[in-house]
C-alpha cells in the first residue's frame, strides 16, 4: 500500500497472493511485474462487502486511486477475483496481460475486468477469460484505448461489452484499432 507517495519504480517482481492499493500518488511505475491471485473475497471470514475502488473495508481490489502520471508497463495480472482499477489522471497501462478475472462476481454492475481513469492511455494490452460484464471500462473523460486484444469475456453476467465507455465518460475519449472477438455478449 502506498499513499501520497512520489517517484517510485517497482520492477521485475512477482507477487503471489498480494495486490496493490496505491492512492493519491504520482509517478509510480510498475514494470515487468507479475500479479498472481492479487485479490479474492473474504466470505469465509464473514466479510461480505463487494469489491469497489473506494472500498474502505477488508474486501479491496487492486487499485490506483486518484494520483497522476502513473505507469504500468509489461505486467501480468492473473487470477484476480476482483476488477483492477487504474484511476487518477494520465495513467499509462501498456503491453500488459489481464486474464482469469472475476470468477464469483463480487463487484458492482458497472465494473469491467480492467477500469481506466481520466486521460488514461490503455494500449497494446490483452484481456481474456473474465466473468464480469465488461472487459475494459473507461470510467472518466479523455481516455484512450488503442491496439488492444480482448476475447472470451462476460462469461458470468447477462449484459456488457468488450469495451464500455460510460455515458458520462465519452467526452474526449478515443477508441482505435482494438480487436474484440469471441465474447459471450
Task: Label each region the model flagged.
Residues 1, 62-63, 72, 114:
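Intrinsic structural disorder
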Residues 6-17, 26-39, 49-50, 66-81, ...:
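Right-handed parallel beta-helix
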Residues 19-21, 41-42, 61, 83-85, ...:
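Structural detector of coil-to-beta-strand junctions
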Residues 43-61:
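Intrinsically disordered, low-complexity Ser/Thr- and acidic-rich flexible linkers and loops
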Residues 56-63, 136, 149:
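Residue-level detector of functional hotspots within protein domains
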Residues 117, 139-140, 162:
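Aromatic- and carboxylate-enriched substrate-binding clefts and catalytic-loop regions
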Amino acid at each position: 500500500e502506498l499513499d501520497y507517495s512520489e517517484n517510485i519504480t517497482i520492477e521485475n517482481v512477482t507477487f503471489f497472493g498480494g495486490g496493490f492499493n496505491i492512492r493519491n500518488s504520482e509517478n509510480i511505475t510498475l514494470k515487468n511485474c507479475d500479479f498472481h491471485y492479487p485479490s479474492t473475497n473474504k466470505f469465509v471470514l464473514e466479510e461480505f462487502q463487494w469489491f469497489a475502488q473506494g472500498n474502505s473495508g477488508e474486501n479491496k481490489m487492486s487499485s490506483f486511486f486518484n494520483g497522476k502520471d502513473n505507469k504500468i508497463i509489461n505486467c501480468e495480472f492473473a487470477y484476480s477475483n476482483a476488477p483492477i482499477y487504474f484511476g487518477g489522471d494520465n495513467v499509462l497501462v501498456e503491453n500488459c496481460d489481464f486474464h482469469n478475472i472475476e470468477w464469483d462476481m463480487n463487484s458492482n454492475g458497472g465494473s469491467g475486468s480492467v477500469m481506466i481513469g481520466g486521460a488514461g492511455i490503455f494500449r497494446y494490452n490483452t484481456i481474456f477469460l473474465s466473468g464480469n460484464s465488461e472487459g475494459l471500462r473507461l470510467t472518466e473523460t479523455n481516455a484512450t484505448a488503442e491496439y488492444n486484444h480482448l476475447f472470451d469475456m462476460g462469461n458470468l453476467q447477462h449484459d456488457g461489452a468488450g469495451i464500455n465507455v460510460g455515458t458520462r465518460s465519452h467526452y474526449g475519449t478515443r477508441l482505435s484499432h482494438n480487436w474484440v472477438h469471441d465474447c459471450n455478449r
